[in-house]
Amino acid sequence: MPIGVPKVPFRSPGEEDAVWVDVYNRLYRERLLFLGQEVDSEISNQLIGLMVYLSIEDETKDLYLFINSPGGWVIPGVAIYDTMQFVPPDVHTICMGLAASMGSFILVGGEITKRLAFPHARVMIHQPASSFYEAQTGEFVLEAEELLKLRETLTRVYVQRTGNPLWVVSEDMERDVFMSATEAQAHGIVDLVAVENTGDLV
C-alpha cells in the first residue's frame, strides 16, 4: 500500500505553532534538492525553479542535489546542467543508488571538488539515444546531424569536467559503461566517495 509523501512538522520563523509539510518541501528549505526519477521536462522545470529561487534568497549558501535517476530526456537534463553552472551558489551533487545516462551528466555537473558518491552507488555513461523530445514512440526522432551535435556537446562536457582525454570519453560513450563509486571517482565523474558509518569523506 503506497504511503504517499511523508509529512513532517515545520515551524516558520516567528510562528508559535508548527505546520505539517511534505518532507521534500521541508528539505528544500534547507537547500537540499532531489532528482529521484527519470529526467523529464516537469522535474527539470521544478529543479530549475528551486535553484533559481534559492539563489535569489541567498546566493552565498551552497545547494545540494541528491541524484538517484536512471536518466531520461537529453534537453531537460542539459537544462538542469546549464542552470547549475549559471546560479551563483556552488551546487554539490550526491549520487545515491544510480546516476545513469543524463543522471551521470547532471552528477558530473556539480561544483568540481564537491561531487560525491555513496559507497554502493552506481554510475553509467553512454551516448544519447535517438529520442529527442518527450515522445518515446518515435514521433520525434533526431536527425543524424542533430544527434551528432548533442553527442559532441555531452562529450565535450565530460572531457572538461572529468579531465579525461577526448578519446577516452568518446570510447566510453560508445556503449553503456557502468562504474562503482570508486571507479567513478577514478574516472573523474565524482571527487569523493562517502565512507560508511562515519561523517568522513575520502
Curated annotation (Swiss-Prot):
One of its GO terms (biological process) is protein quality control for misfolded or incompletely synthesized proteins. CDD domains: S14_ClpP_2 (cd07017). The keyword Cell inner membrane does not apply. It is an enzyme of class 3 (hydrolase). It is found in: Plastid, Chloroplast stroma. One of its GO terms (molecular function) is serine-type endopeptidase activity. GO terms for cellular component: chloroplast stroma; endopeptidase Clp complex. Keywords: Chloroplast, Hydrolase, Plastid, Protease, Serine protease. Pfam families: CLP_protease (PF00574). It catalyses: Hydrolysis of proteins to small peptides in the presence of ATP and magnesium. alpha-casein is the usual test substrate. In the absence of ATP, only oligopeptides shorter than five residues are hydrolyzed (such as succinyl-Leu-Tyr-|-NHMec, and Leu-Tyr-Leu-|-Tyr-Trp, in which cleavage of the -Tyr-|-Leu- and -Tyr-|-Trp bonds also occurs). InterPro entries: ClpP, ClpP/crotonase-like_dom_sf, ClpP/TepA, ClpP_His_AS, ClpP_Ser_AS. Its main location: plastid. Component of the chloroplastic Clp protease core complex. Cleaves peptides in various proteins in a process that requires ATP hydrolysis. Has a chymotrypsin-like activity. Plays a major role in the degradation of misfolded proteins. HAMAP family: ClpP. This is ATP-dependent Clp protease proteolytic subunit.
